Amino acid sequence: MNIQALLSEKVSQAMIAAGAPADCEPQVRQSAKVQFGDYQANGMMAVAKKLGMAPRQLAEQVLTHLDLSGIASKVEIAGPGFINIFLEPAFLAEQVQQALASDRLGVSQPTRQTIVVDYSAPNVAKEMHVGHLRSTIIGDAAVRTLEFLGHHVIRANHVGDWGTQFGMLIAWLEKQQQENAGDMALADLEGFYRDAKKHYDEDEAFAERARNYVVKLQSGDTYFREMWRKLVDITMTQNQITYDRLNVTLTRDDVMGESLYNPMLPGIVADLKAKGLAVESEGATVVFLDEFKNKEGDPMGVIIQKKDGGYLYTTTDIACAKYRYETLHADRVLYYIDSRQHQHLMQAWTIVRKAGYVPDSVPLEHHMFGMMLGKDGKPFKTRAGGTVKLADLLDEALERARRLVAEKNPDMPADELEKLANAVGIGAVKYADLSKNRTTDYIFDWDNMLAFEGNTAPYMQYAYTRVLSVFRKANIDEQALASAPVIISEDREAQLAARLLQFEETLTVVAREGTPHVMCAYLYDVAGLFSGFYEHCPILSAENDAVRNSRLKLAQLTAKTLKLGLDTLGIETVERM
């Protein structure tokens, strides 16, 4: 259940009854402090101004129409006109029971949409590096959340699988007589790419052959298409290993590379010309956009076809948006691409809207993100100043976690230690990123991310095992527990219950804004509240069976919420640590 939505509806009805316009916003928010109740309605200020009355006067009138019987134990006006709402313990108890009775913890399903999520997008013939981490894991957390809510999610891995470099790579592959390219490892392919580029730059005859191969590849020649396909296959096979290690849900079936849109490009250029949106300018085809200005203050020209007939990324992105609406029938499209691409995307989408390829009713959303920085505040690099390979980063995470786990559990069997180290190490890397607001840069710090205190994966994983340990110590009659009532009489019980029941609200924010850090903050808060509850409200040594069972049920909902919440982030939980 979404309590915030329920209260918003009730307060809105009371505001309208008190004379507010039908489209008034009650602005019901989770209260920042316990003394302000569980929720606070802050909408009186804006509405009172429109009505020409004092906010507190409006709040008083709203209260005469506000019926929260069975939901709130107390409703009071604070300050200039805030309405503080304190939830009824019996209501909390009933909602906890309902959440426990449902596999979905009582989370309702919104109207089902088809949502395309564009994320990860590595390049062919290159190994994934740390620059791919944020898009891959933030996008995957959004996908998991949207799918849990019941949406039809289409993962779109916009792989860089096309371009002039493929002539060079195929020519080098041929020169090396490596017809059995499938046996090449991607680490070899990294060097292979560098060698091909070196020859391309230094050997004019080789470069000429490479340019001819591009033409043959683009014209659909079977032999060259097959060679190109080998390069794509090698790359994606290696990338899949990384995706699996990261516990990311992408598969080969989700690849929708740049090459997919090639057949659409000539038709799009012709159509934009026919619609009067694109014009010839100095031999190129250009769309001038009033919405963007150049340095002189004139409409910015966006090239969609070069003088030599070649197309640009913008042309591909126009085709891509069109395809996602017309062919995939998207109701909403999310792009997890770094912030440096923002203007480029905005220009492509402006053309898309002007051409009528995607209606305004279908949101195209750039969920941009900042950079991963080293401790020096500069882009994260190797000691030698090179790009950090993602596989190397994950290897180091595993090694550090292995040492950490072995130190705390010297007698743990090797296979168990490896499994736990993997969950902790990979979880730490992912959670350190996901727990930061995606729009900002963040400092990558091994010591912080592997710490067992603070908002980290090891702390959250430990918090989960700590709740489970209560059940291991208790001799529980499952049937008796299932039918036992929840009784909320202590403040710490009420605070924990109220926060647990805000799981759906948290999921809704993550789904709407694409901000997994909101879920991380919520789960960290739940873990902290459980810790206080556990300390001050004895569970196994409670004064009687009724209180014991009730508190066990609160612990049960805590464990389920932590597990499900971490699962939406792609963070593995463990039974023991």
Curated annotation (Swiss-Prot):
It catalyses: tRNA(Arg) + L-arginine + ATP = L-arginyl-tRNA(Arg) + AMP + diphosphate. Keywords: Aminoacyl-tRNA synthetase, ATP-binding, Cytoplasm, Ligase, Nucleotide-binding, Protein biosynthesis. One of its GO terms (cellular component) is cytoplasm. The keyword Transmembrane helix does not apply. It is an enzyme of class 6 (ligase). Its EC number is 6.1.1.19. CDD domains: Anticodon_Ia_Arg, ArgRS_core. GO terms for biological process: arginyl-tRNA aminoacylation. It comes from the Bacteria. A motif ('HIGH' region) lies at residues 122-132. The keyword Cytoplasm applies. Belongs to the class-I aminoacyl-tRNA synthetase family. Monomer. PANTHER family: ARGININE--TRNA LIGASE, CYTOPLASMIC, ARGINYL-TRNA SYNTHETASE. This is Arginine--tRNA ligase.
